[in-house]
Regions:
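A glycine-rich beta-to-alpha transition motif near the start of alpha/beta enzyme domains, typified by
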Residues: 1-111, 119-121, 131-136, 141-257
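Acyltransferase
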Residues: 123-126
Length: 257
């Protein structure tokens, strides 16, 4: 099977945007092969909907049906490129999100900012004697591990204690540095990601939830680069969250699987 794809680099979170139409039942297997065999070393794979660049609401489906903010940003940049450039913003549809995602494009600086789904809940779990906050989001949950060095062993224990979800992230946080480890159920993959958009949002939302009304800005240094988040609080609740940073797009490539 010959697969056409676009390599994308949203803040180091290497992503394959697959142009070849692949049925939902085959996506997990195709994605696993691409992550194992493509020379770019992809951390995740998204599948572009048919005639997406011409659609009123372009569609991207992630490999396990999960939500991904970085892939959303990269996909919006690709749609803009296919349309000839010049868009300042556009709406896209992506798996794991119940509503369209608005993306602001800053082509002059090579950046894109996605208006992210607001987390839907917070719970605490107990893991190895410590209390761990888990932020529930559409299509993915994130466990936040403050003052904790990255640890595969600890992540495994956290995953066992988390409720089932399409994707589960464990965010290891040291000051303003965040290291994401993400599990996707459909593909069975566990990846130390270079950056994680939804994890960035989860942490920013968690930090902002008790702050005064108004807009609060956060920036986290992740292995592949810096991601920014802006949380607008109104009447004690998060009303709007925007996440973004750099995006680089490559040219179309092919691989035989």
């Amino acid at each position: 099977m010959r697969i056409r794809y676009i390599p994308a680099d949203p803040a180091g979170n290497l992503t394959a945007l697959t142009l070849t139409q692949v049925g939902p039942e085959e996506r997990a297997a195709v994605a696993a092969q691409m992550m194992a065999r493509c020379p770019e070393g992809f951390e995740q794979v998204g599948f572009i909907g048919e005639d997406a660049a011409k659609a009123v609401l372009p569609r991207l489906d992630m490999m396990g049906g999960e939500f991904c903010g970085n892939a959303a940003r990269a996909f919006a940049c690709w749609v803009d490129r296919q349309r000839g450039g010049g868009e300042s913003s556009l709406n896209i549809s992506i798996s794991g999100a119940c509503q369209p995602v608005a993306v602001e494009l800053d082509a002059a600086h090579g950046k894109a900012y996605a208006q992210m789904p607001i987390p839907i809940g917070l719970e605490e779990i107990r893991v190895m004697g410590r209390t761990v906050p888990v932020v529930h989001m559409e299509g993915i949950d994130h466990a936040l591990m403050p003052d904790c060095a990255p640890s595969q062993e600890l992540a495994q224990a956290v995953w066992k204690a988390m409720p089932a979800q399409d994707a589960q992230g464990v965010m290891f946080i040291q000051n303003t540095t965040m290291t994401p480890l993400v599990y996707v159920a459909a593909t069975g993959t566990r990846v130390w990601e270079s950056s994680c958009g939804s994890g960035t949002v989860a942490l920013a939302w968690y930090l902002a939830r008790k702050l005064a009304d108004g807009e609060h800005g956060f920036a986290f240094d992740e292995p592949g680069g810096r991601l920014e988040a802006r949380v607008t609080m109104r009447m004690g609740r998060a009303a709007r969250i925007v996440m973004g940073g750099s995006v680089l797009l490559g040219e179309e490539r092919e691989i035989e699987l």
